[in-house]
């Protein structure tokens, strides 16, 4: 079957925002107006089409980014709904990785919120072209112009209004389109499906003229001819202005800002027009780079004629189809039944069912093309971030980076039957979400779950209980401490064992030094002249790595350390890889002692938004949690307090804050860095764990 839509008519975009800015509602309206949903789903009724896991419908937040295809004005929209809660930042990160553009949704009452900053920075990291939608214009306190100011102050970006609101709060009627200089007013009776283009209301004419000028001036700066014409008194026509706004979006010169109220069905159709007019097609963004099987850099252009390459960006377990792998096809054509190679894992796979997803409905397809986002059923080996490609033209596309988890809980199944179910369920959950890790504590035999925050782990436990029917006891959350050495250490160690027959002999000299923060573990062999034969060096590495998982302070993983093997001795008969493994293990443990290992604890960046009356109590409480206040500023009539606080002092903070502020203060927290724990904390942790 030939391609139905030319690749320049594709818009692969995500909707990103802070929690509760109305992202899922905006997506729902998009699906409704593009004719994909016959009934609008409301988030607060737990009926939104995109939020299809029970946990999402109950909590009214979006956890997994479902991919949906819709059509508008002859263009094909592939929409990825991303979560706005800080514990699910990983979902946003991997969505942005496969998108070409994004709509950033703001709550007009709140402006730019902490998680907006986080997702915006992720957008900057992947250079994603963006447009901004100031939503909830019908809410009390909605202020479109505050949103514009916030984008400058908090995101350091240049916003340009391409619409202005007509009225606000209860009187929000519609918007003025500054490109066409017409007003758009929605008809309340038709669920927003009908609207009229009318003249700009007289009382807003001056304001519209002022902001139209700002828009034109920002746009003509991007084109010499348009600039010359403008200076001579000729304004750009509508087509030229749209072309220049598109150019600005693609280059990040400025970000067009629109307004509306998705919940009240106002402003969604012009937002869709803006997605089509201004966001990039796969041809407008740089072609993806990768490395071929010889390690050379190669480029895969968005073209059906190029060799096949696709990236798995999400894995989900579907009750009807089994494992579904969401993939973005970057180049070539994918046909069901063909063989591909998972070049990341060097495994062959056969493409079985191919599905086009609409939230949680699905349509079987036989072929997919460059630019498509498809769901593949039944892949056995694929994990998030893997590349699948043509076996004869192998490539590994740019890898995704995933953050380290900072919080962990122990989980114990209640019965033998639960034990088996738990193993299967955890393997599936870990495959779906790379920021969720599962490990076993060798000493206690407990299963440990690690994640990005309390909510992240709460939801995983909830899925285990509901979806997989596992009955288990859950331990209290624990902090993921780390250890590192603070000074260099040199160690010589000899391992000897003579017990008749073949003995064991190995001698190693290690130089162990601190690496810079975030530098990780680095091993280097500086052996010259065969003091330790090549075949034994992997044994040395294995011995060192066996200690990295449990350091000498309190048995936590060792990070940021450089180890060099500088000398050694061996015996022709008695030496073996195992003997060198034992020797290097003991030598490295000794080096960790000598190098004055210390305990590191995760420090969280905390932002509290509180009415002014409670500021003193909030700051006092953060100080009592060993928090360091970084600064305060006013946002509207609320005070915003930024602090760095150790994670171990933040458990249960949500309830404390609620009672301290009568439920009026809110906070967000995300991992910032690891820092050395004070001596008293270290002693307490050692007593508990060592």
UniProtKB/Swiss-Prot annotation:
GO molecular function: GTP binding; GTPase activity; guanosine tetraphosphate binding; translation elongation factor activity
The organism's place on the tree of life at top rank: Bacteria
Main localization, broad class: cytoplasm
Subcellular location: Cytoplasm
CC per GO annotation: cytoplasm
PROSITE patterns cross-referenced by the UniProt entry: G_TR_1 (PS00301), G_TR_2 (PS51722)
Family according to the record: Belongs to the TRAFAC class translation factor GTPase superfamily. Classic translation factor GTPase family. EF-G/EF-2 subfamily.
Annotated protein name in UniProt: Elongation factor G
Function: Catalyzes the GTP-dependent ribosomal translocation step during translation elongation. During this step, the ribosome changes from the pre-translocational (PRE) to the post-translocational (POST) state as the newly formed A-site-bound peptidyl-tRNA and P-site-bound deacylated tRNA move to the P and E sites, respectively. Catalyzes the coordinated movement of the two tRNA molecules, the mRNA and conformational changes in the ribosome.
Source organism of the structure: Bradyrhizobium sp. (strain BTAi1 / ATCC BAA-1182)
């Amino acid at each position: 079957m030939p391609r139905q839509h030319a690749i320049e008519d594709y818009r692969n975009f995500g909707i990103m925002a802070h929690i509760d800015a109305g992202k899922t509602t905006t997506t729902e309206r998009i699906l409704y107006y593009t004719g994909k949903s016959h009934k609008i789903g409301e988030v607060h009724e737990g009926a939104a089409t995109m939020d299809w896991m029970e946990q999402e419908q109950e909590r009214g937040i979006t956890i997994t980014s479902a991919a949906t295809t819709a059509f508008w004005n002859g263009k094909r929209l592939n929409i990825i709904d991303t979560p706005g809660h800080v514990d699910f930042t990983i979902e946003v990160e991997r969505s942005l990785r496969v998108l070409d553009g994004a709509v950033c949704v703001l709550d007009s009452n709140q402006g730019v919120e902490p998680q907006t900053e986080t997702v915006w920075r992720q957008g900057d990291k992947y250079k994603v072209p963006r447009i901004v939608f100031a939503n909830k214009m019908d809410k009390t306190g909605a202020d479109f112009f505050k949103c514009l100011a916030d984008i400058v102050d908090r995101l350091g970006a240049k916003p340009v209004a391409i619409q202005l609101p007509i009225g606000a709060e209860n009187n929000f009627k519609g918007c003025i389109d500054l490109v066409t200089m017409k007003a758009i007013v929605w008809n309340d009776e038709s669920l927003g499906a009908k609207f009229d283009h009318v003249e700009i209301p007289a009382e807003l004419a001056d304001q519209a003229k002022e902001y139209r000028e700002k828009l034109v001036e920002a746009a003509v700066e991007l084109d010499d001819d348009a600039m010359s014409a403008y200076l001579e008194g000729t304004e750009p026509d509508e087509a030229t202005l749209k072309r220049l706004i598109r150019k600005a979006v693609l280059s990040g010169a400025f970000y067009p800002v629109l307004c509306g109220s998705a919940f009240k069905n106002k402003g969604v159709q012009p937002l869709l027009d803006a997605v089509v007019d201004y966001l990039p097609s796969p041809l407008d963004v740089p072609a993806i780079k990768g490395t071929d099987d010889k390690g050379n850099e190669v480029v895969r252009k968005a073209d059906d004629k190029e060799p096949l390459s696709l990236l798995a960006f999400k894995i989900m377990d579907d009750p009807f189809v089994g494992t579904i792998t969401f993939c973005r096809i970057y180049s070539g054509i994918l046909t069901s039944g063909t063989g591909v190679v998972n070049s990341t894992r060097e495994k062959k796979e056969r493409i079985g069912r191919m599905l086009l997803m609409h939230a949680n409905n699905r349509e079987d397809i036989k072929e997919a093309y460059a630019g498509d986002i498809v769901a593949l059923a039944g892949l056995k080996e694929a994990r998030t971030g893997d590349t699948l490609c043509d076996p004869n033209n192998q490539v590994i596309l740019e890898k995704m980076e995933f953050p380290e988890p900072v919080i962990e809980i122990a989980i114990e199944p209640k019965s033998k039957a639960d034990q088996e179910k738990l193993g299967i369920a955890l393997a599936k959950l870990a495959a779906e979400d790379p920021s969720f890790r599962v490990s076993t504590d060798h000493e206690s035999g407990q299963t440990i779950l690690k994640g990005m925050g309390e909510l992240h782990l709460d939801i995983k436990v909830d899925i285990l209980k509901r979806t997989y029917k596992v009955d288990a006891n859950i331990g209290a959350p624990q902090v993921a401490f780390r250890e590192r050495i603070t000074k260099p250490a040199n160690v010589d160690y000899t391992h000897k064992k003579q017990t008749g027959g073949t003995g064991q002999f190995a001698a190693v000299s290690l130089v162990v030094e601190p690496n810079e923060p975030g530098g990780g573990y680095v091993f280097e062999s500086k052996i010259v002249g065969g003091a330790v034969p090549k075949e034994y060096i992997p044994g040395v590495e294995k011995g060192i790595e066996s200690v990295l998982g449990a350091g000498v302070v309190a048995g936590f993983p060792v990070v940021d350390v450089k180890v060099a093997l500088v000398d050694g001795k061996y015996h022709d008969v008695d030496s073996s890889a195992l003997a060198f493994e034992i020797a290097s293990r003991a030598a490295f443990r000794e080096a960790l002692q000598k190098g004055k290992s210390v305990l590191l604890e995760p420090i969280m960046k905390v932002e509290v938004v509180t009415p002014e009356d409670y500021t003193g109590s909030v700051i006092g409480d953060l100080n009592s949690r060993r928090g360091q206040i970084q600064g305060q500023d006013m946002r509207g009539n609320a005070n915003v307090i930024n602090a760095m606080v150790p994670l171990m002092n933040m458990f249960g903070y949500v309830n404390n804050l609620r009672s301290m502020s009568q439920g009026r203060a809110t906070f967000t927290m995300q991992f910032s860095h690891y820092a050395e724990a004070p001596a008293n904390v270290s002693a307490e942790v050692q007593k508990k764990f060592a």
